[in-house]
């Protein structure tokens, strides 16, 4: 909402926040809706969204609680309900009280049904069945725990990829995010003055470097020192958080990656999700190059 206001004798335009209830109704965990809602709401800088999350809604009794909540706190409804009877009751109720409802999976389901030539089975929570993908994610998580921060380097060639970088360059959170997608990611710290980690001497998996702006890295490291009980006023002049030392450390790591032919991702302004997506693109490119090599090349 825009309002006019006066400041130093001039008219200015002031943007005020718009408050809105948003109901997320799911017959499973609600993870899909949460992701969609976050992605869309993030495009509105001045919105103040009050989320009402309704998960595991699979019976009429459970749905009636939702309808009472929507009536008490009116606002648009996003739904991933599959069962036709529940969908119809939700739609009719929202229509009566003038509330918009969107079944967010419908456009994708319609598209796939048309191209596949098969009707969707309409069963809630199918993405959470304990299938091979589920167990692959669990296996990847165990792998990351065993190979985090340079541990068990002898097993690096069992990984799908290896992340390298200086301390606090987001190797660990990126590895765990990838594990949640079923990707086994080892990660090894690069430390100036120490011998090259043995796991990196002749890796047969893609190795990807992570780097970061020195000022941002120093801020992360200072925060880390606070969390582990360090005293920033004493530690701030050490090499760990000294600007020139950190710059030299990052340059050294970049040169090592360049010498080894490892691609480098700057994570300074990237979310973990964006970094992971770029990592997977680089891994795919690595495999494409390998496939294009002649036998024995």
Swiss-Prot record:
Its EC number is 2.7.11.32, 2.7.4.27. It comes from the Bacteria. Bifunctional serine/threonine kinase and phosphorylase involved in the regulation of the pyruvate, phosphate dikinase (PPDK) by catalyzing its phosphorylation/dephosphorylation. One of its GO terms (molecular function) is ADP binding. This is Putative pyruvate, phosphate dikinase regulatory protein. ADP binds at residues 165-172. Keywords: Kinase, Nucleotide-binding, Serine/threonine-protein kinase, Transferase. Belongs to the pyruvate, phosphate/water dikinase regulatory protein family. PDRP subfamily. The keyword Plastid does not apply. It catalyses: N(tele)-phospho-L-histidyl/L-threonyl-[pyruvate, phosphate dikinase] + ADP = N(tele)-phospho-L-histidyl/O-phospho-L-threonyl-[pyruvate, phosphate dikinase] + AMP + H(+); N(tele)-phospho-L-histidyl/O-phospho-L-threonyl-[pyruvate, phosphate dikinase] + phosphate + H(+) = N(tele)-phospho-L-histidyl/L-threonyl-[pyruvate, phosphate dikinase] + diphosphate. InterPro entries: Kinase-pyrophosphorylase, PPDK_reg. It comes from Granulibacter bethesdensis (strain ATCC BAA-1260 / CGDNIH1). It holds the Pfam family Kinase-PPPase.
């Amino acid at each position: 909402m825009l309002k006019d206001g006066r400041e130093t004798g001039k008219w200015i335009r002031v943007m005020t926040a718009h408050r809105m209830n948003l109901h997320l109704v799911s017959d499973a965990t609600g993870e899909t809706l949460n992701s969609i809602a976050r992605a869309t709401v993030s495009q509105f800088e001045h919105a103040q969204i009050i989320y009402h999350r309704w998960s595991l809604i699979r019976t009429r009794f459970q749905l009636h609680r939702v309808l009472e909540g929507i009536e008490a706190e009116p606002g648009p409804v996003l739904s991933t309900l599959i069962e036709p009877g529940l969908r119809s009751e939700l739609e009719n109720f929202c229509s009566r009280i003038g509330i918009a409802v969107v079944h967010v999976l419908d456009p994708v389901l319609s598209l796939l049904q048309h191209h596949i030539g098969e009707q969707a089975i309409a069963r809630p929570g199918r993405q959470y069945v304990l299938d091979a993908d589920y167990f692959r994610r669990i296996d990847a998580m165990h792998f990351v725990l065993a190979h985090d921060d340079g541990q068990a380097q002898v097993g690096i060639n069992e990984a799908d990829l290896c992340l390298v970088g200086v301390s606090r360059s987001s190797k660990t959170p990126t590895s765990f995010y990838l594990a949640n997608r079923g990707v086994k990611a080892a990660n090894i710290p690069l430390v100036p003055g120490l011998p090259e980690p043995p796991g990196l001497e002749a890796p047969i998996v893609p190795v990807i470097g992570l780097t970061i702006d020195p000022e941002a890295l120093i801020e992360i490291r200072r925060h880390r020192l606070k969390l582990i009980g360090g005293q920033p006023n004493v530690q701030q002049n050490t090499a760990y958080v000294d600007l020139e030392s950190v710059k030299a450390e990052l340059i050294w790591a970049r040169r090592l990656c360049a010498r080894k032919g490892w691609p480098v991702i700057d994570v300074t302004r990237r979310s973990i999700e964006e970094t992971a997506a770029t990592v997977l693109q680089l891994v795919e490119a690595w495999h494409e190059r390998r496939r294009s090599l002649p036998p024995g090349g």
